[in-house]
From Swiss-Prot:
Keyword Secreted set for record: no
Tissue: Testis.
Listed GO biological process terms: chromosome condensation; sperm DNA condensation
Positions of transmembrane segments: none
Family: Belongs to the protamine P1 family.
Superkingdom as given in the UniProt entry: Eukaryota
Annotated compartments: Nucleus; Chromosome
Species whose genome carries this gene: Dromiciops gliroides (Monito del Monte)
Taxonomic lineage: Eukaryota, Metazoa, Chordata, Craniata, Vertebrata
Name of the protein this chain belongs to: Sperm protamine P1
Originating gene: PRM1
An annotated GO cellular component: nucleosome
Role according to the record: Protamines substitute for histones in the chromatin of sperm during the haploid phase of spermatogenesis. They compact sperm DNA into a highly condensed, stable and inactive complex.
Length: 64
């Protein structure tokens, strides 16, 4: 019984990780980028920066 329990547990964990990995990665990337941008561009307004990035991303996705 111990063996079976271990196996089922690892299986469920791997499934959960696969689903959640992409989201976590994206969040980490965004957080890091935004932090760096803040440090570098203290003068530039945050709104304009985010808007520009969002538009460029949308265009790229639609065209390609």
């Amino acid at each position: 019984m111990v063996r079976y329990r271990r196996h089922s547990r690892s299986r469920s964990r791997s499934r959960y990780r696969r689903r959640r990995r992409r989201r976590l990665r994206n969040r980490r990337r965004r957080y890091r980028r935004s932090r760096r941008g803040r440090r570098r561009r203290r003068r530039g307004s945050r709104r304009g920066y985010s808007r520009r990035r969002y538009q460029s991303r949308r265009r790229r996705r639609r065209r390609y």
